[in-house]
């Protein structure tokens, strides 16, 4: 588990990691031995048709967050055939499976998300969604099938494994239904990383770059995602006599403009942050001064420092404007997912695996973005390693983005993702096999 405030540490440029890696290639690296590597390749070739069929079945039968009943049943039934120690119903519908290696060592974990999105699929695929208005438009069907394939391969290598692997199939990454807990936070709360304690956790996510490429960086890679609601409480009056009221619409407009100064004037421009207003609701008729206006929006940041700094600045602006004009207000701020933080030491240790498998020209530098991902809760509990897997057909000039009704990942990414995860997990265990659980240097 990382210690200290990560906002005080600067993201390590990937170029420096790769430069250090290339400088070290002349010396022996702990890596999967050739015999095991060939075994992985052979098993992937043998099972890839089955894994793709699993992916297509999941794609045809998408389920929303905390409702992944059939997906979890399929995952559990497949894991049962592998002889793993399985916990069902973790965080509602999650599945956690433990593979105990034949040799002593620490425990590493790997996670895939299982939920779909409320989107009507428009791909026209022969295996398109059978559930109206629900689609796997973010690649979670791909992630789940890759992780099942990884469990299949590593189970066949049990005698070679130094330590343990925890496979985490997570519900509700896109968010739990209103009023329900869910996702990674609930999995952590219910002990998905315990018994035995996990020393490092890995995950991948589909991204519309070419198959054969991955995107990666140490440090912050995605932003936190918070929401806010501001209610301006004015006083109604006739539209022809505005001086007798307090116009909540005018004050709301002033607040929208003033909030933009939080990012442009109060935040370090080298530390990304966004304050966006998504909805404004107020007023009832054209000739009535609005008494109440509600604004809703999102705040996205990378660093913990900005996440702590911005909310009180926002409220001070709202309070000042409202008090100046004799209005009241209510400011509600709802923290969401934290930023995903790739542990720098773990990143430096494991980056060579990506380069050795793919070649340094295929390991692209990920530029941190203010999208959000609840893998961050796992990475707060134990060092995390998160990367993006290219799923675009290289023959096509462009591909539909995530969350598009046309999103259609190239299935050739599935065996490659399986191979990458197998090597990452085995390399991590090999490099930590002499370190007792709970005393990992990561």
Write out the residue ranges for each language-model feature.
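Bacterial N-terminal signal peptides that target proteins for export
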Residues: 1-17
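Bacterial N-terminal signal peptides
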Residues: 13-27
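Acidic/His- and Gly-rich active-site-bordering loop/insert found
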Residues: 32-136, 145-162
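Metal-dependent amide/peptide-bond hydrolase catalytic core
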Residues: 32-35, 81, 250-442
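Histidine/acidic-residue-rich, glycine-tolerant segments that coordinate divalent metal ions
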Residues: 125-135, 142, 154, 159-279, ...
């Amino acid at each position: 588990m990382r210690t200290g405030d990560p906002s005080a540490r600067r993201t390590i440029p990937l170029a420096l990691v790769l430069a250090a890696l290339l400088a070290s290639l002349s010396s022996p690296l702990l890596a999967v031995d050739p015999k095991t590597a060939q075994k992985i390749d052979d098993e992937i070739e043998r099972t890839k048709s089955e894994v793709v069929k699993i992916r297509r079945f999941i794609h045809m039968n998408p389920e929303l967050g905390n409702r992944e009943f059939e997906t979890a049943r399929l995952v559990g039934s497949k894991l049962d055939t592998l002889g793993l120690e399985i916990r069902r119903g973790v965080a509602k519908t999650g599945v956690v499976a433990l593979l105990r290696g034949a040799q002593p060592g620490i425990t590493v974990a790997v996670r895939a998300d299982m939920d779909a999105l409320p989107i009507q699929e428009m791909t026209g695929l022969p295996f398109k969604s059978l559930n109206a208005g629900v689609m796997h438009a973010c690649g979670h069907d791909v992630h789940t099938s890759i992780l099942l394939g990884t469990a299949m391969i590593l189970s066949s290598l049990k005698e070679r494994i130094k330590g343990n692997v925890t496979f985490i199939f997570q519900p509700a990454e896109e968010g739990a239904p209103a009023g329900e807990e869910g996702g990674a936070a609930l999995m952590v709360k219910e002990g998905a990383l315990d018994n035995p304690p996990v020393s490092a956790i890995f995950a991948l996510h589909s991204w519309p770059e070419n198959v054969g490429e991955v995107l990666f960086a140490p440090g912050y890679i995605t932003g936190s995602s918070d929401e806010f609601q501001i209610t301006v409480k004015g006083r109604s009056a006739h539209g022809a006599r505005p001086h007798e009221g307090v116009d909540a619409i005018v004050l709301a407009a002033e607040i929208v403009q003033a909030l933009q100064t939080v990012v442009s004037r109060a935040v370090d421009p080298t530390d990304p942050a966004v304050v966006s207003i998504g909805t404004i609701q107020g007023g009832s008729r054209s000739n009535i001064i609005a008494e109440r206006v509600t604004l809703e929006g999102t705040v996205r940041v990378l660093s913990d420092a900005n996440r702590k700094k911005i909310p009180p600045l926002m409220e001070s602006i709202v309070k000042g404007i409202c008090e100046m004009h004799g209005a009241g207000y209510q400011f509600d701020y709802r923290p969401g997912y934290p930023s995903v933080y790739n542990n720098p030491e773990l990143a430096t240790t494991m980056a060579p695996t990506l380069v050795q498998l793919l070649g340094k020209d295929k390991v692209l530098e990920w530029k941190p973005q203010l999208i959000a991902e609840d893998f961050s809760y796992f990475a707060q509990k134990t060092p995390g390693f998160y990367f993006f897997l290219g799923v675009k057909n290289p023959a096509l000039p462009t591909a539909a983005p995530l969350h598009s009704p046309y999103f259609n990942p190239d299935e050739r990414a599935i065996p490659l993702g399986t191979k990458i995860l197998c090597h990452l997990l085995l390399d991590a265990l090999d490099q930590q096999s002499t370190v007792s659980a709970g005393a990992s240097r990561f």
